[in-house]
Amino acid sequence: MASISETSDDGSNGGDPNQKPEEPHKNPQEGKEEENQNEKPKEDDHQEEEVENVPQIPPQMPLELIVSTIATLRRCHYPTLSLLSDSFRQVISSVDLFQTRSLIGSTEPVLYTLITFTSPNFEEPRWFILQRRNNTSLQLSLVTSLPPMFPGCTTVTIGHKIYVMGGLRSLNRRAKTVFVIDCRFHTWRYLQEMQVARSYAASAVIDGMIYVVGGSTKRSDDWVEVFNVETNTWENVPSVLSPYGRSKAPFNVHFVLDNKIYILDGNNRVAYDLRGRRWEDWGPAGNQLGYFWQVLYCVVDNLLYAVVPDHLHVTPIVVYDPREMGWRPVMGVDYLPNLVYSESRMTNFGGKLMILGCYQSQARFDYYGEVNVWCVEVALERREDGEIWGKVQSLSLVNKFRKSPVFVLSRTVTV
């Protein structure tokens, strides 16, 4: 019977920094003893195929040439290359390698998803990485060097980093905590705390600045904060308070489009213009934007994509163009696998739609007492006539759990 797989640290400094006295997270090493941990994946017969196209590298090659050579290769080959020598292992865990990858344009999108387990007992959310074992197969693996997250935290990504803000501590106390994850090495460190404790807030990145909205008692002077990643400082954003939203709304559903952050606040739909610093109500009856995006959605190239139930539209994926103020079908996608999409998560994966979900609803297991997690990869193409076409490129079984998973969110970084 399969179980949750782990990513090892491979000597990449993946341990926790010193814990704060209030820090509720468990030590990452304790996670290795929990029931939901996986066995190490078995070596398959395709081990040799992973390095089939890797160029031969002389053992005495200078370190600089090793860096420039490895930087051109896909990251799925790195675990095998790290076994060749100490020099290779040193290069693969170095900052120079990732800087070189960025300079020559060989970076890749990497998907992370935050998963909690609710059956038989609730567990704090943990990060999983969707990685390629070779050129084709995908595997969803627990990142053991990262601690559990606070429930209700909000996250954004910039380059190879994930910024995590707020959430609920023990006894449902809101947190001001902020930390950043370096996805190159799976390390993390604390940043300056927010000025206001928040949970289930909305967040967005505009012009390299991180905005956090709501998740606290509603007051005009501090309901919005902005974080400068260069100076590690927070500032309140003065603005006229939205008359439409509730005071302590959990902003589970939000996205950024045209420099505005759109928020589903109960039955209200509000938008905050991050540059103009003003609120708008975009939810009156007849506003098409609110039709489909409440379940499964993400933004690609400033267009909003959503998966819709079969009875609401003739195609399973639709796209919203803010310039046209309306939804259109994504052509070429006549069907999607019958996952429970209301419990799935979709994200922009290098210009593609990547969906993680299960065929069974939460707390429902198969004959073997497991829940299978599937990944659907949908490629997108804009034709000359402006129509958006899609194609389901793959459907992959990426993990099996003995507990009931809940997909909290998915994020993509560039590494």
From Swiss-Prot:
Pfam families referenced in this protein's UniProt entry, alphabetically: Kelch_FKB95
Please indicate if the UniProt record lists Nucleotidyltransferase as a keyword: no
Residue limits of the F-box domain? 56-103
Signal sequence interval, chain numbering: none
Keywords from the UniProt entry: Kelch repeat, Repeat
> Any keyword Repeat?
yes
Kelch repeat start and end residues: 161-208, 210-254, 260-309, 311-355
User: Which region ranges are annotated with the description Disordered?
Assistant: 1-58
Q: Where is the composition biased (Basic and acidic residues)?
A: 19-45
Name of the protein this chain belongs to: F-box/kelch-repeat protein At2g29600
Annotated organism of origin: Arabidopsis thaliana (Mouse-ear cress)
Lineage of the species this protein comes from: Eukaryota, Viridiplantae, Streptophyta, Embryophyta, Tracheophyta
